[in-house]
Amino acid sequence: MDYEALKDQWSDVEDRDGIRLSWNTFPSSRMEASRLVVPIGAVYTPLKDKPDSPLLQYEPVTCKAPCRAVLNPYANVDVRARIWICPFCLMRNPLPPHYKDITESTIPPELHPLSTTIEYQLARPAPTPPIFVYVVDTCQEEDSLKALKDTLVMSLSLLPANALVGLITYGTMAQVHELGYTECAKSYVFRGSKEYAAKQVQEMLGLLSAGVRPNMPQQPARPPLGPAARFLLPVQQAEFQITNVLEQLQRDPWPVANDKRPLRCTGVALSVAVGLLETSFQNAGGRIMVFTSGPATEGPGHVVGPELKEPMRSHHDIDRDNIKYYKKAVKFYDAMAKRAANNGHIVDVFAGCLDQVGLLEMKNLVNYTGGHMLLTDSFTSSQFKQSFVRIFDKDANDNLLMGFNASLEVLTTKELKVTGLIGHAVSLNKKSSSVGETECGIGNTCAWKMCGIDPSSSYGVYFEIANQGGPAAVQPGPQRGMMQFLTYYQHSSGHYHLRVTTVARNLSGPAGDPTLAQSFDQEAAAVLMARIAVFKAEVDDGPDVLRWVDRMLIRLCSRFADYRKDDPTSFRLEKNFTLYPQFMFHLRRSQFLQFFNNSPDETAFYRHVLNHEDVGDSLVMIQPTLDSYSLEHEGSQPVLLDSASIQPSHILLLDTFFHILIFHGETIAEWRKAGYQDQEGYENLKALLEQPKEDARELISDRFPLPRFIVCDAGGSQARFLLSKLNPSTTHTTGGYGGGVTSQTIFTDDVSLQTFMDHLMKLAVSGTS
């Protein structure tokens, strides 16, 4: 099968199962696997939209303990004997009584050959409706606070009618608003400079007095019993009160001198929010949504002092270990993140500030709990408002697309073992026969807790080939390795759902089987390797990570390219490997591994988004797309991400996922400034100027977070966003000045892709890594 047909096949599998594998044939021995260089891995999107598949309204049929695999199309079913054989542990299981009518021709949906992904609505209802706690920073300008209040009031109409809502505001003090008290505005105040233990928070809020009575049945529309009901009210009952409280919010009254930052106790507000939820709502779906407009400057978790002359930490400070508050703040927020994750609660952080707010220190609050991280200049910006609204997107039945309190378990057949996961989750420390000996990412477990999950949440799951002792019993036909992904989550309709994806791939033949190389998916592999590189970058030095990326690339090319030893001119890669070196070239230069021009908060944000998206979107972040528009061609033409693509009479549209940029070449910019497009007879120029805007609108329409939109001209200051992403094939060191070169000269010492490839070929053919 040729490469294009294979790509279509992998794309169909991704649409059906939400999964892309780095290798679509598994090596049959551990020795063979070690020579692959790129690990066997899957980028899995559990809640990928599947409009055509039915929701099964019954419990899944599972294998006996300890296996617990779910019945799937790969199971052998004996309809006469009413038994099925589990493909994971080969145990025989009786079919339940309600399967008595099945025959070879009438089978239940989960056994249909195309039902490799299926979703069940479980009988177990969620213990409470979804909970939303807004944690609002009041140390901000009037216009910004007003815009934020308007957005929050509007968001109440997007929540499910039975959702519980709470409000905490903070500045110099943290205040928990008692929404259930209607006589007047009433709140509990916590001092911003003091650290409160979980028990203290619960005592001060009176949460320990009655407690939720165990084993009490819950009605879905009623708030749970217990003292927390004073602070968390159902939207449908209390929309008026909540709106009133939000509209009456004032700026923090504490005076701020000109040479000082406002006193902001983000850490105290967060610990109060986590304490409020963990007392009464353990293992219930809830979101703590933090809106901050500046760094924490007092109390636990503060990231900078109140003096303005003391700057926020930079990457340079972190490298030199010149960080006064960093380690203590990280320790505080990480402990908070673990508490929230253990209880199934999500933490989102929305920053509306030109300066850093301490996302670097707080990142694990979001990363451990599957929350959203959003970095904007102000809460007045459309980027914040539109991104925030997208979080509350709904399905055809008017249910929120977000899932709560989610967990993922991976089962494998004896040939495979799971080595870890890289994504927004924490380990559930579950051991099984599927757990491998080595560790990649969050390892030593076969189950993870994600808390928050949405249709684009994607996870990198890594595998190894098990040690097979002695010759395996030869089975007729090709042997298969299998994996099953079980995703449990609380649906916003009030029920628990289970989504099951079962994947089977052939094992390779004897050593040197060509099907192994042909099964390499370079796009999925690049994304899986990028996740490992970013995971390493969190703990290792930057140069060490770059060396690791280079070493792995050289080893892969040495293993799979065709060449004569020590002859770089003979170097050839098969079609399904040719793009991989260029993905690695752009990954090395990307904002995920290079800190130049990025603050630590921005780096934390970019890495967070990379670890959330699927293969297609992640590739756009690693290697942005570039389209060219000109009067000679109709519509857009994809062009190389190269400085040679900049032409005076062309318009370029760059999509980096985080930015969408329209760049007018020199001549086009002059024509536009002269107003030719408004004159009669120049309709084609007007259409040319409009076309990239239309395409940009389409790109923005379904993206989260909303990208920053930039329109610039050749020579303008904003053009730097484009120039920094291009391969510098035309620099001040190539080509003579005054020559007839029409492309842009880039002043940089970075090597070009051509130089990078020359070095790669030289090293690969010499057999040194």
Curated annotation (Swiss-Prot):
Question: Partners and quaternary state?
Answer: The COPII coat is composed of at least 5 proteins: the sec23/24 complex, the sec13/31 complex, and the protein sar1.
* Name of this chain's protein: Protein transport protein sec23
Q: Which compartments is it annotated to reside in?
A: Cytoplasm; Cytoplasmic vesicle, COPII-coated vesicle membrane; Endoplasmic reticulum membrane; Golgi apparatus membrane
GO biological process: any one?
intracellular protein transport
- Indicate which residues the UniProt annotation says bind Zn(2+): 63, 67, 86, 89
What InterPro entries does the record point to? ADF-H/Gelsolin-like_dom_sf, Gelsolin-like_dom, Gelsolin-like_dom_sf, Sec23, Sec23/24_helical_dom, Sec23/24_helical_dom_sf, Sec23/24_trunk_dom, Sec23_24_beta_S
Please provide, alphabetically and separated by semicolons, the GO molecular function terms listed in this UniProt record: GTPase activator activity; zinc ion binding
| The keyword Protein transport appears for this protein | yes
One cellular-component annotation, GO:
Golgi membrane
Q: Which species expresses this protein natively?
A: Aspergillus oryzae (strain ATCC 42149 / RIB 40) (Yellow koji mold)
Q: Which SUPFAM superfamilies match?
A: beta-sandwich domain of Sec23/24, C-terminal, gelsolin-like domain of Sec23/24, Helical domain of Sec23/24, vWA-like, Zn-finger domain of Sec23/24
Transmembrane feature ranges: none
Function of this protein? Answer: Component of the coat protein complex II (COPII) which promotes the formation of transport vesicles from the endoplasmic reticulum (ER). The coat has two main functions, the physical deformation of the endoplasmic reticulum membrane into vesicles and the selection of cargo molecules.
Query: Where does the protein principally reside?
Result: cytoplasm
UniProt KW keywords = Cytoplasm, Cytoplasmic vesicle, Endoplasmic reticulum, ER-Golgi transport, Golgi apparatus, Membrane, Metal-binding, Protein transport, Transport, Zinc
Membrane topology, as annotated, equals:
Peripheral membrane protein
Is Secreted one of the keywords?
A: no
Q: Which family does this protein fall into?
A: Belongs to the SEC23/SEC24 family. SEC23 subfamily.
Domain of life according to the entry: Eukaryota
> Cross-referenced PANTHER family, in alphabetical order?
PROTEIN TRANSPORT PROTEIN SEC23
